Amino acid sequence: MSDKKSIWSTVDHFLTKTRKIIVNSVTALILIVITFSILGGVGSMFTSSDKIDTQDKVLWFKPIGVVVDSEVPGSGSFDIESIIASGGDQVEQHELQDLLDVLNHAATDESLAAVYVNVSELGMYWSSAFKIAEAVKNIRDKEKRVIAYAENYSNNSYLISSQANEVLISEYGQVSAFGFSRKREYYKDLYKNLKINYNVFTAGDFKSGPEPYTRDSMSENDKLAWNEFANPMWEKMTGMMETARNLTEGTLQNYGDNAWLMFTDNPEGAEVALELGLVDMIVTKEEIRSWMYEQFPNEDEDKYAYPDRVSIYDYLSTIDDKSDGVKSNNKIAVINVEGAITTGEVAFGVAGSDTIVDNIQAATQDDSVKALVLRV
């Protein structure tokens, strides 16, 4: 009997020891895998294996979407035309400072072969267009080659593109830098014919807001106010365009005033732009690929492909942000208010009052914030 107990005791001891060895081995293996995974992740943060190569490449500055002061994550456009144009997808938002950082850094980056600019699909306010145009001009002034192309040029896109060394246009394109316009609908006669009575209370001479309900045309005061705003803006814009293109003062104004006559004589808008010196070359999509291959051959030696290039945000990732980790007890808080002010949260094109109030309260409660800028 004692011999049987001894055998079972030995077997039990062996199984127990074996189980401990297996469990400990598996545990150790799991810990080793986790440890190496963590070390590998940390190491990848400091290695340059994913470093963006910019040597002899063309910075491809072709943002599509809209320029904003501050991106609203996960928010699409509420503009019907934008939704239709984008096929229902959310509109891509590009922060102005990111675009300026890319262009300003490219101006002194000797590794880049050139900068290609195409902003024909980028929506922006005039103030943003002026800043981007100045950044492109700075690149050209630093003797870095800048090539601009678009199928069609609007006021803003031509302002930016005109600062390039070479301006190209599609053979079916047109420069539509005709100046500013403003259109309003007036309902006074409509309501009168529909026999709808309403009351509008106004005070002051320059109160044009309710004019669509009180007039059937633009008032002289409204015309005066608009011209006081638009004329200096247009003069600055045409001045930058004409200086960059070495055009005689008044060329753009004459083009805008008489474009319909010019197009009557020659319906090819691209040819008219070339004759006036607004552009340097008319190209098809195939021709621009071939032309750029001659200027900047790609590694694959494919003359039908665009040159070796680096995108905006890949290039942005190579720029060191010197402000990272810098702490200050004297800060200036900037709160951006873009779009129509309504109740609720901020969304693209909507300045939600709840979010604005929360941001203001957060700034006032931060002792390190010494001033507040409300950018509307």
Where are the model-predicted features located?
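Short acidic-hydrophobic, aromatic-tinged amphipathic segments that line or gate anion-handling sites
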Residues: 168-169, 279-285
